[in-house]
Curated annotation (Swiss-Prot):
UniProt-listed GO biological process terms: 'de novo' pyrimidine nucleobase biosynthetic process; 'de novo' UMP biosynthetic process; amino acid metabolic process
Residues binding L-aspartate: 86, 169, 223
SUPFAM superfamilies with a match to the protein in the record: Aspartate/ornithine carbamoyltransferase
Protein's name in the database: Aspartate carbamoyltransferase catalytic subunit
Length: 312
């Protein structure tokens, strides 16, 4: 099948066939990353703008690297350096950007729906790199790619998402993506860090991590923002780690070679024990590599690649 979308804004309504097209397109992209010369002429002359109104060196660098390998010109706008600090609205920024005639815009913003607003106003394609607590579609796609690469398929696989579900756009996007591909998703976290609407997500929810460990194929620990303790949502980081930290003892309870994942950056000793983060079952570094390949695939499709065929 071909690709007809102008933007990639969310995963929730993305059909399984389109998800799989992105993942299939990422395979040759990853091979390109292993070449001595990591550069394609595919999108020479195309311009990609990164608008990061939230700080994220890892994600921004991943997108920049992906665009450069594809041969596109990249420009980045960090909020601290932008006119927004002088009272300029997002709409003003959009109009200024439109005048620069970009081909593709990547946006990360603290407000849910910011990427959708941008897509409606711009002729250029838009990629959502995270909007508020709404979604983070490219993270879910790179997570899926990593799981498929290791497991072959996620259909029927038991996937645990552990931690701060309430504030996690990564969790939301992963739930939609994994459900679309037939995985068994279990959300695990303290009651104070589960969203009130979670029953409508259609997946199992529990406060007890240890009960769900047996038979799990993937454990994805979510980043815990340390300010959650200060806001009273957690009694202490020590207690959180005791109840929800991924330790060697807990990994043994799975009874299999369970994959250990994390969107990063990791709070070692809180979300994941260092020995587990560094173990052979951890695919955290693979997620970083696969993130570039998946973002290359998305850019390739949005900029006119249209199919999984890659031009050498």
């Amino acid at each position: 099948m071909g690709w007809s979308r102008k933007d990639l804004l969310h995963i929730e309504d993305l059909p399984a066939k389109e998800i799989q097209l992105i993942l299939n397109t990422a395979k040759p992209m990853k091979e390109i990353m292993s070449r001595a010369v990591k550069k394609l002429p595919t999108f020479r002359g195309k311009s990609v703008y990164n608008l990061f109104f939230e700080s994220s060196t890892r994600t921004r660098t991943s997108f920049e690297t992906a665009a450069k390998i594809l041969g596109a010109d990249t420009s980045s706008l960090a909020v601290a350096q932008s006119s927004l600090n002088k009272g300029e609205t997002l709409l003003d920024t959009v109009r200024t950007l439109q005048a620069m005639k970009p081909d593709l815009v990547v946006i990360r913003h603290s407000s849910s729906g910011a990427a959708q607003f941008l897509a409606k106003e711009l002729k250029a394609g838009v990629i959502n790199a995270g909007d508020g607590q709404h979604e983070h579609p490219t993270q879910a796609l790179l997570d899926l790619y990593t799981m498929q690469e290791r497991l072959g398929s996620v259909e029927g696989r038991k996937i645990l998402l552990v931690g701060d579900i309430l504030h996690s756009r990564v969790a939301r996007s992963n739930v939609w993506a994994l459900k679309n591909l037939g995985a068994e998703v279990v959300l695990v976290g303290p009651p104070t860090l589960l969203p009130p609407e979670i029953k409508s997500w259609g997946v199992k929810t529990t406060f007890n991590l240890d009960e769900e460990l047996p038979g799990s194929d993937v454990i994805m620990a979510l980043r815990l923002q340390l300010e959650r303790q200060q806001s009273g949502l957690l009694p202490s980081l020590r207690e959180y780690s005791q109840l929800y930290g991924i330790t060697a003892e807990r990994v043994k309870k799975t009874g299999k070679q369970t994959l250990i994942m994390h969107p990063g950056p990791v709070n070692r000793g809180v979300e994941i024990e260092s020995s587990i983060a560094n173990s052979s079952q951890s695919v955290i570094e693979e997620q970083v590599t696969n993130g570039v390949a998946v973002r290359m695939a998305i850019m390739y499709l949005l900029l006119g690649g249209g199919t999984a065929h890659v031009v050498d």
